[in-house]
Amino acid sequence: MDSVDGLQCLTMTAENPPSGDLIPAPLVTCKLCLCEQSLDKMTMLQECQCIFCTPCLKQYMVLSIREGCGSPITCPDMVCLNHGTLQETEIACLVPLDEFQLYQRLKFEREVHMDPLRTWCPVADCQTVCHISAGDPGQPVLVECPSCHLKFCSCCKDAWHEESSCRDSQSAMPEHGALFGTDADAPIKQCPVCRIYIERNEGCAQMMCKNCKHTFCWYCLQNLDNDIFLRHYDKGPCRNKLGHSRASVMWNRTQVVGILVGLGVIALVTSPLLLLASPCIICCVCKSCRGKKKKHDPSTT
């Protein structure tokens, strides 16, 4: 077995045949690339004992780290009976150091997001994990950042509002720095649904949260889940702020209309066929039901 910084990599090795023996090394089929590889090019997972070729497993891990938002990396075999999960030692052995550090950071951020007793300080330059005192679930709790001493609400992350609800409170505290999401052009904002932090580096203003799949406008945080034609950017304060040319927007709408028309044509064509075939289908179902009833009826045996 190989080792990197004291961590064991479960790379398999084939037993050396006796000298003068020309028996070829056994080959194993990788379930990812479906290619046959020798045992020295395969890696076995600790938890489920599934075997994959090392290059495929490395690529799978890198993609899972970049797209998984810190969630556990599961066995790439879709029919794995043990539902194995990769251990941190395995990940550290097979991916570059920067990718492993990214995985640890995303995993920690996910743990903080899922923990009801921990949250991030909303000050952009702080990035401190704050502890929330236990209270009634869903009720606002005063949280004080141990680093910048900002007092904010545990629910809406706005400045603490003891005598008003989260919806009514829109106060800002510029003396503590720019809060996440208070500026339309802020590089980091919170998803309006799951409140996870999202950073926008480039691209259009139509955003989709990787955590809850909610689609919204980056500038005003309005819901865009049902706006398939992107009409939100035709009027109002976000007009022409989508980030694409007018021609590309029209082409997108044309494609959406084409898909809807195609589905409508398919429905019109298939509906008469279904109506004609429905008596035959009903007869077949009734016949099979009668057969099952006779088979299980004790009076006929």
Swiss-Prot record:
* Enzymatic reactions: [E2 ubiquitin-conjugating enzyme]-S-ubiquitinyl-L-cysteine + [acceptor protein]-L-lysine = [E2 ubiquitin-conjugating enzyme]-L-cysteine + [acceptor protein]-N(6)-ubiquitinyl-L-lysine
Gene Ontology CC annotation, any one: mitochondrial membrane
Q: Which positions in this protein are listed as binding Zn(2+) 2?
A: 121, 126, 145, 148
Keyword hit for Kinase: no
Q: Write out the catalytic residues in the record.
A: 204
Task: Kindly list the positions annotated as binding Zn(2+) 4.
Answer: 191, 194, 209, 212
Residue intervals passing through the bilayer? 256-276
User: What metabolic or biological pathway is this protein involved in?
Assistant: Protein modification; protein ubiquitination
Provide the residue positions that the database annotates as binding Zn(2+) 1.
30, 33, 53, 56
CDD domains hit by this protein: BRcat_RBR_RNF144B, Rcat_RBR_RNF144B
- Please explain the role this protein plays, according to its UniProt record: E3 ubiquitin-protein ligase which accepts ubiquitin from E2 ubiquitin-conjugating enzymes UBE2L3 and UBE2L6 in the form of a thioester and then directly transfers the ubiquitin to targeted substrates such as LCMT2, thereby promoting their degradation. Induces apoptosis via a p53/TP53-dependent but caspase-independent mechanism. Plays a crucial role in maintaining the genomic stability by controlling the degradation of multiple proteins involved in mitotic progression and DNA damage. Regulates epithelial homeostasis by mediating degradation of CDKN1A and isoform 2 of TP63.
Question: How does this polypeptide assemble, per the annotation?
Answer: Interacts with UBE2L3, UBE2L6 and LCMT2, as well as with BAX. Interacts with TBK1; this interaction inhibits TBK1 phosphorylation and 'Lys-63'-linked polyubiquitination.
Q: Which family does it belong to?
A: Belongs to the RBR family. RNF144 subfamily.
Protein name per its UniProtKB record: E3 ubiquitin-protein ligase RNF144B
Q: Which organism is it from?
A: Mus musculus
Q: Tell me what gene encodes this.
A: Rnf144b
